[in-house]
A protein has these predicted regions:
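Short loop/helix-cap segments at secondary-structure boundaries that form the rim of catalytic
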Residues: 75-80
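Active-site phosphate/pyrophosphate-binding segments
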Residues: 83-152
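Glycine- and acidic
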Residues: 37-42, 49-53, 92-97
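Anionic-ligand anchoring segments at beta-strand to alpha-helix junctions in alpha/beta enzyme folds, i.e.
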Residues: 1-42, 48, 60-74
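Transmembrane helical cores of multi-pass ion-transport proteins
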Residues: 44-53, 63-66, 114, 120, ...
Length: 152
């Protein structure tokens, strides 16, 4: 959900497009407008989240295409999706899904960069710069973590 909210802000600010982000558990009950031009992006760390799987099936039954952003290969959501982007975050040890969330954000940033380029919002140089900055994320995170004792 939260990675989707970041994606929504990116899409609105860079692409000036309207998208809706919803909890999978509420999706079917919100009377969404869905047709064959609709793309539903399902986000799940495990690829087995029942609410997400059911929301995807609901959308597909109404003509939507479904893209899954998931961590686990061969999962139910992967099998049900039209398209799959694997985050390859590895297993989550902590309750907070930090690795999966970070990789989901990276995938959304790359999707937006590609869309911006294909729609002429970004030229080649802007797209490359956008992706380069994203690639710097681990380096920047390392520097921040090295200063963790200085941060209050």
């Amino acid at each position: 959900m939260h990675a989707g909210l970041v994606a929504q802000a990116l899409v609105k600010s860079i692409l000036h497009m309207h998208i809706e982000v919803q909890m999978a558990s509420e999706f079917m009950y919100s009377d969404p407008v869905i047709d064959e031009k609709t793309l539903v992006i399902a986000v799940s760390q495990s690829g087995e989240t029942i609410d997400t799987l059911e929301a995807m099936k609901y959308a597909k039954n109404r003509g939507a295409k479904c893209l899954a952003i998931i961590n686990v290969k061969g999962s139910s959501i992967a099998r049900e999706s039209d398209y799959v982007l694997y985050t390859n975050a590895g297993p989550e040890i902590a309750v907070a899904s930090t690795k999966a969330y970070t990789t989901q954000l990276a995938v959304f940033y790359l999707i937006v960069a590609r869309m911006a380029h294909s729609r002429g919002v970004f030229d080649d140089a802007q797209t490359q710069s956008f992706v380069r900055e994203l690639q710097r994320t681990p380096e920047v995170m390392k520097k921040v973590l090295e200063r963790r004792r200085d941060i209050h």
